Amino acid sequence: MQLTVWTYEGPPHVGAMRVATGMEGLHYVLHAPQGDTYADLLFTMIERRNKRPPVTYTTFAARDLGKDTAELFMKAARDAYERFKPQAMIVGASCTGSLIQDDPGGLAKSLGFPIPVVAIDLPAYQRKENWGAAETLYQLVRALAGPKAPAPGAKRPERAPGVRPTCNLLGPTALGFRHRDDITEITGLLGKLGIDVNVVAPMGATPADIARLGDADFNVVMYPEIAGQAASWLHRIFHQPFTKTVPIGVSATRDFIKEVAQLAGVDATAVLEAASTRLPWYSHSVDSTYLTNKRVFIFGDATHAIAAARIASEELGFKVVGLGSYSREFGRELREAAKHYDVEPLITDDYLEVEAKVAELHPELVLGTQMERHIAKRLGVPCAVISAPVHVQDFPARYAPQMGFEGANVIFDTWVHPLMMGLEEHLLTMFKDDFEFKDGAMPSHLGTGHAAPVAEVIAESAPPAVAATAPEIVSVANAAASAAVWAPEAEKELQKIPFFVRGKARRNTERFANENGVATITVETLYDAKAHFAR
């Protein structure tokens, strides 16, 4: 067990809650102590849902452990059925509740409810949130759609002439990163291809909708971490093919359109020719040339991290210097992607390892989760959020998908704006000592009048740590290896170098000083090092 102040994923029962909360007519009875009810806040506070999750907790306390906790669970299940009248019920235990070993599935089925009751057995101490969501969706699909499965060996009937092809959208859940808007975007894209959506699951689906998943011609796997297992089962039992491409980014969206068109047997030429997105033109415009070869570090769930790496490299001209994920189940896919960009993959759920890697690589932009936002802020690096887990500001009121052509526009704005702000910050820092721009200067539009006198503080000689006015990304290894000391005037001169290359300039200067036996780095040393490495 590891004590930490941050986790990328919650326990697996939180994943089950995400599925249940996204659906309609489904209720989740969770054998859990009172302390586990914190999970409600994830949906009401962070996602800003206007109603509580459809979850009933047994909320046993320490005094109940000497009694019949099984009876406590059965009473909670009966009360939930009578109060909410769900179409189906799932039952399980939280990480703490599983230690009691009361068998919620067997207890609930013994109550004889006239609705489907699906037991969700989640290994709380071996698996995490996304796996829990995937397992819950898989068990629901098996239990509700399974009775309508064709006989073994039976072939899938051909679609009648003139009938529009249909598909299911699999994977969107509550608390997902832009899942709500991705559904709208992909539904519209499929509509342009002449394809109807049969069911979106689990988001917005009822148990009756899950039961008719087999009616569709194929499945669109929007988020493989959640829908991959269910899609594989539907392919095996109902002979429904499913998509492999996740349409995040312009190139991936075009590939997705071609793949879907092939599965549905439709012509995608008109849709591809009419595709409208501003990202390609914006990224090729003169104003965007400064994006070329920007060093970017990417971390998130596997789906969004791999997609972000492709966009960064192929569509924006960034240089991917780091790629990682907390999704251990998709380690193989991430390693293959990392090999493509010639970087070492980082597969971990320890945010301290991620922070150390960011500090080591000195990126100019970090793309990650809410934690990477904090890490980048501490290190003084621009950051954009690309993946769950996220905080409340990443559930915007506006339409902001990540998928499709409009999603590409949103991604361009989201990723580039932090760099724009960084450029402005650099200009302000560069000219802050100029006689026209210092704090005591009169505004230029007010003529040549005299400004109010301002007390001017003369900088005294100070240690390098005090002289520095902007956060530096300096790894522990580099700091330990450097024996040279920075003179105050050299530190001041270093601040005139743009912040997004300042770390590299510092490292090169210290390396030059160490190789040439320079004990104190002066302004002359700084420029000698610049000339040396410019050859």
Curated annotation (Swiss-Prot):
EC category: oxidoreductase
InterPro entries given in the database record: ChlB/BchB/BchZ, LI-POR_suB-like_C, Nase/OxRdtase_comp1, P-CP_red_C, Protochl_reductB, Protochlorophyllide_Rdtase
Residue positions binding [4Fe-4S] cluster: D36
Keyword Nucleotide-binding belongs to the record: yes
Coiled-coil features, chain-numbered ranges: none
Annotated substrate binding sites: G422, L423
Entry annotation: catalytic residues: D287 (proton donor)
GO BP terms, alphabetized: light-independent bacteriochlorophyll biosynthetic process; photosynthesis, dark reaction
GO MF assignments: 4 iron, 4 sulfur cluster binding; ATP binding; metal ion binding; oxidoreductase activity, acting on iron-sulfur proteins as donors; oxidoreductase activity, acting on the CH-CH group of donors, iron-sulfur protein as acceptor
The reaction(s) this protein catalyses: chlorophyllide a + oxidized 2[4Fe-4S]-[ferredoxin] + 2 ADP + 2 phosphate = protochlorophyllide a + reduced 2[4Fe-4S]-[ferredoxin] + 2 ATP + 2 H2O
Names of the cofactor(s): [4Fe-4S] cluster
Record pathway: Porphyrin-containing compound metabolism; bacteriochlorophyll biosynthesis (light-independent)
Cofactor note: Binds 1 [4Fe-4S] cluster per heterodimer. The cluster is bound at the heterodimer interface by residues from both subunits.
Gene3D superfamilies found in the cross-reference section: 1.20.89.20, Nitrogenase molybdenum iron protein domain, Proto-chlorophyllide reductase 57 kD subunit B
NCBIfam families cross-referenced by the UniProt entry: DPOR_BchB
Protein function: Component of the dark-operative protochlorophyllide reductase (DPOR) that uses Mg-ATP and reduced ferredoxin to reduce ring D of protochlorophyllide (Pchlide) to form chlorophyllide a (Chlide). This reaction is light-independent. The NB-protein (BchN-BchB) is the catalytic component of the complex.
Family: Belongs to the ChlB/BchB/BchZ family.
The protein's assembly and partners: Protochlorophyllide reductase is composed of three subunits; BchL, BchN and BchB. Forms a heterotetramer of two BchB and two BchN subunits.
UniProt-recorded name of the protein: Light-independent protochlorophyllide reductase subunit B
Organism for this UniProt entry: Rhodopseudomonas palustris (strain BisB5)
Gene: bchB
